[in-house]
């Protein structure tokens, strides 16, 4: 009964890392588009 807890933590960590990755790509896309249009 103690094993599901670390698994939940790893899943939450993967979700947060995925969100940070999408946010980073979004920011880079904005910077790249602003660099092109300027």
From Swiss-Prot:
GO terms for cellular component: chloroplast thylakoid membrane; photosystem II reaction center. It is found in: Plastid, Chloroplast thylakoid membrane. Coiled coil: none annotated. Disulfide bonds: none annotated. GO terms for biological process: photosynthesis. InterPro entries: PSII_PsbL, PSII_PsbL_sf. NCBIfam families: PRK00753.1. One of the components of the core complex of photosystem II (PSII). PSII is a light-driven water:plastoquinone oxidoreductase that uses light energy to abstract electrons from H(2)O, generating O(2) and a proton gradient subsequently used for ATP formation. It consists of a core antenna complex that captures photons, and an electron transfer chain that converts photonic excitation into a charge separation. This subunit is found at the monomer-monomer interface and is required for correct PSII assembly and/or dimerization. This is Photosystem II reaction center protein L. It comes from Nephroselmis olivacea (Green alga). The lineage of its organism: Eukaryota, Viridiplantae, Chlorophyta, Nephroselmidophyceae, Nephroselmidales. The gene is psbL.
């Amino acid at each position: 009964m103690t094993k599901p807890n670390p698994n939940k933590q790893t899943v939450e960590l993967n979700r947060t890392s995925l969100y940070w990755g999408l946010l980073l790509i979004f920011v880079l896309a904005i910077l790249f588009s602003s660099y092109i249009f300027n």
